[in-house]
């Protein structure tokens, strides 16, 4: 994000992208209101004036939501989420699930790079496991948890293995 800009202003540029412009039309004022609406949709509290705070003053959970909001503003068909759960507490992670699930239901393909497997497996319908740059597994989360090569690569072998 642009840390010196207010959170909602981080969405103005994506809302002027050719793709978004074709879909929504309107002028700058319309886009400002739409930016605040999108931020509210991803969990920014309008009443607490969070959309009007500089992005650099926001906690990590809000910064991650801001990045998701920027993708929503672009009307992306595919979103690559790199460690979206990293650094977040259980409550923050839980609050992201409905948003990610809704985006997926609406046709957005989510490609997630994530080491927090427990959380990832709650939302994923397909998992590709890489180990040292090589594809180790491709299948459902349930199958991944049963796969011996995946368990050994990510959880260790024998006594040190933990899920």
Where are these regions (language model features)?
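Q-loop/switch helix immediately C-terminal to the Walker
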Residues: 4-20
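A short, surface-exposed alpha-helical micro-motif characterized by mixed small hydrophobic
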Residues: 120-122
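Conserved ABC ATPase "signature" region
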Residues: 12, 26-49, 53, 98-101
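Hydrophobic anchor residue at the start of the ABC signature
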Residues: 68
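Catalytic Walker B motif of ABC-type/P-loop ATPase nucleotide-binding domains
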Residues: 79-82
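H-loop/switch region of ABC-family ATPase nucleotide-binding domains
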Residues: 114-115
């Amino acid at each position: 994000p642009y840390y010196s800009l207010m959170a909602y202003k981080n969405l103005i540029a994506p809302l002027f992208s050719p793709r978004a412009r074709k879909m929504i039309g309107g002028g700058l004022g319309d886009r400002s209101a739409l930016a605040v609406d999108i931020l509210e949709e991803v969990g920014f509290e309008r009443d607490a004036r969070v959309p009007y705070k500089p992005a650099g003053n926001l906690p990590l959970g809000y910064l991650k939501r801001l990045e998701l909001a920027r993708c929503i503003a672009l009307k992306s068909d595919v979103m690559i989420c790199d460690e979206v759960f990293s650094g977040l507490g259980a409550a923050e992670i839980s609050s992201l699930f409905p948003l990610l699930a809704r985006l997926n239901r609406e046709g957005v393909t989510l490609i997630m790079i994530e080491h927090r497997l427990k959380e990832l497996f709650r939302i994923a319908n397909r998992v590709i496991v890489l180990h040292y740059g090589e594809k180790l597994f491709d299948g459902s989360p349930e199958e991944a948890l049963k796969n011996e090569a995946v368990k050994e690569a990510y959880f260790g072998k024998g006594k040190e293995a933990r899920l």
